[in-house]
């Protein structure tokens, strides 16, 4: 099984693929000025898709919904969801939620506030299972999150 984790940032698109058959991980990052044109995101996703080849599932976090090209955060989330589900089969795409679960397209669109800017939460939730007392610092191109974990 192969799973790609995507982080759609405000200026960069990051993705890592995990191959559970041979336990190999491959990562890719592309500068992606989404605020100039949403098509930059589409082209970047397709570039990484072509680099990684076929995979079974896609797990997505985002902060790009906050860039100026979108009228508001909700519209940005919906646009990004729809874009992903046009490139990949909808049944293979899941969006990380604040409830520590993954939502399919329909539920993600109905719960945009629960998936908007959840990249920090995904990292903090994962780390908290292994380290009980620390500070997570997530420095991106457009946001910085400082999260105490206790």
Predicted regions and their residues:
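Nucleotide/phosphate-binding catalytic cleft detector across ATP-hydrolyzing
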Residues: 1-10, 16-137, 147-150
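Conserved Rossmann-like nucleotide-cofactor binding loop
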Residues: 11, 142
């Amino acid at each position: 099984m192969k799973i790609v984790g995507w982080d759609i940032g405000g200026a960069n698109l990051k993705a890592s693929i995990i191959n559970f058959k041979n336990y190999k991980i491959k990562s890719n990052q592309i500068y992606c000025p989404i605020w100039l044109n949403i098509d930059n995101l589409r082209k970047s996703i397709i570039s990484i898709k072509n680099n990684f080849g076929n995979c079974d599932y896609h797990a997505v976090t985002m902060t790009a919904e906050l860039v100026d090209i979108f009228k508001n955060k909700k519209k940005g989330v919906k646009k990004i969801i729809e874009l992903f589900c046009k490139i990949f089969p909808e049944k293979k795409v899941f969006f990380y939620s604040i409830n520590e679960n993954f939502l399919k397209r329909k539920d993600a669109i109905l719960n945009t506030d629960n998936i908007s800017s959840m990249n920090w939460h995904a990292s903090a939730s994962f780390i908290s299972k292994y380290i009980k007392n620390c500070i997570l610092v997530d420095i991106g191109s457009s946001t910085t999150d400082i999260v105490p974990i206790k």
